[in-house]
Amino acid sequence: MSDLLHKLNFKIADASPEYKQRRKIQMIRFFTASAVTIFASRFAYRATVSRQYIPTLFQGNHSPPLSYNFTTDAAVAVGTGTLLCGSVTGMTVFGLCWILDVSNIKEFGWRMKSMLGGWESEKKLSEAPMDEESSYIQDSLNDILDGKYDFENDTEEVAGELKTN
């Protein structure tokens, strides 16, 4: 197989076995979600066709028969709609993960951040000058974390002032 890939000049021929296994798992997830979507759509189609009301020759088509149950019909419609929505969403997500070579949520965040220019924006923001109020707050927090303030004495002084008032 590798010889054929080298002959056809595919870059994946030089990839590591771990990378090939990772891509294979992504592909299997996508095709599994696609198969579930196909089965769900067939199920929804059959559920719709079986509930279809076809009047007889001299029956009006504006009034359904008396034995018709609207509650069951609504429940089946909600169930099949949810099933279709979930399966199509899964197929879309796994397809995008396969295309973008993403295996988990953290990788997806990194990939989106790099694609949307987040690294450059973060670098520009870190190089921007800090205003006076923000630097004062940052210095105060750093002093608190370094232990430059003694809060035990401050609370005793405040308690003494409250007793005198």
Swiss-Prot record:
InterPro entries for this protein: AIM11 (IPR038814)
Subcellular location(s) of the protein: Membrane
Disulfide bond residue pairs: none
The keyword Membrane is annotated on this UniProt entry: yes
Keyword tRNA-binding: no
Membrane topology: Multi-pass membrane protein
Source superkingdom: Eukaryota
Gene Ontology cellular component terms for the protein in this record: membrane; mitochondrion
Transmembrane segments: 27-49, 78-100
Keyword entries, A-Z: Membrane, Transmembrane, Transmembrane helix
Family: Belongs to the AIM11 family.
PANTHER family attached to this UniProt entry: ALTERED INHERITANCE OF MITOCHONDRIA PROTEIN 11
Name of the featured protein: Altered inheritance of mitochondria protein 11
Organism, as annotated: Candida albicans (strain WO-1) (Yeast)
